[in-house]
Amino acid sequence: MNLSVKLPGLNLKNPIMPASGCFGFGKEYSEYYDLSLLGGVMMKAATQFERLGNPTPRVAETSAGMLNAIGLQNPGVQQIIDHEVPRLAKYDTSIIANIAGSSIEEYEFVAASFNQTTDVDALELNISCPNVKEGGIQFGTDPFMAKKVTEVVKKASNKPVYVKLSPNVHNIVEMAKAVEEAGADGLSMINTLTGMKIHLPSRKPLIANKTGGLSGPAIKPVAIRMIYEVRQQVSIPIIGMGGITSAEDVLEYLIAGADAVAVGTANFQNPFVCVDIINELPEVLEQYGFNSIEDVIEKRGITV
């Protein structure tokens, strides 16, 4: 069965890729399976300089997912270009670089830096990380700022730009339309929901940062709803994410309006989850009357 999907800058052999922040730069997972099996890899966020991240503890398990407040820990964009990208480029899979910053100037610098390499196929513009005290959240929750940073990154980069939207907004459609108008080539959605967990013995937040990003199955219905709403109003492709653990979840996302998907938290529970989903997808598509991924995209919203 044909599982391929063509998106701006991305010729995916299948619509499955690990989400940024849940796969590092693929090194550990490459010891479990051939990364060439994946449609693509969304790399861990890159900033202008090295970041050590937030204080610990910065991860907490929840009843249907997890909270994290990592704080964009990374070695800096040049180290990523020099060391991580060449290693990933050995695999036959698309590479998406996630870029972040605490100012428009930093976003511009990081985006332009990736022009050095032809091995990165597209950028994922992280305007929505909810756990960084400087920047991030302001870009992801204000349509004007989101539009401005998207315009700057598009001008600085020679690669397609997928803007990662935050669900922590009053109107996700307004945000999507703003970045589409700014020239975004696609969207990735949703990022994590802001949450908190209390440590009962101390009566204080369990995470040192107090709040963290909630991910996992708990947020899937929110993601499905938001993608459905955005798909009615924008025409650019959507990479859907949030709580995906199975091929059935993937099909649900595609029907709601996504064109490809990213798997996040589930990688921590099962390092083979992306490969398992890829293997299960043909049978699930056939079960529901589809003969390819493109067939799902063409027929979604149509009840036969």
Swiss-Prot record:
The cross-references to InterPro entries, in alphabetical order and at most eight, read:
Aldolase_TIM (IPR013785), DHO_dehydrogenase (IPR050074), DHOD_1B (IPR033888), Dihydroorotate_DH_1 (IPR024920), Dihydroorotate_DH_1_2 (IPR012135), Dihydroorotate_DH_cat (IPR005720), Dihydroorotate_DH_CS (IPR001295), Dihydroorotate_DH_I (IPR049622)
- What CDD domains does the database record attribute to this sequence? DHOD_1B_like
EC numbers for this chain: 1.3.1.14
Where does this protein act, in terms of pathway? Answer: Pyrimidine metabolism; UMP biosynthesis via de novo pathway; orotate from (S)-dihydroorotate (NAD(+) route): step 1/1
**Main location group:** cytoplasm
Q: How does it assemble?
A: Heterotetramer of 2 PyrK and 2 PyrD type B subunits.
Q: What is this protein called?
A: Dihydroorotate dehydrogenase B (NAD(+)), catalytic subunit
Which source organism?
A: Oceanobacillus iheyensis (strain DSM 14371 / CIP 107618 / JCM 11309 / KCTC 3954 / HTE831)
Organism lineage string: Bacteria, Bacillati, Bacillota, Bacilli, Bacillales
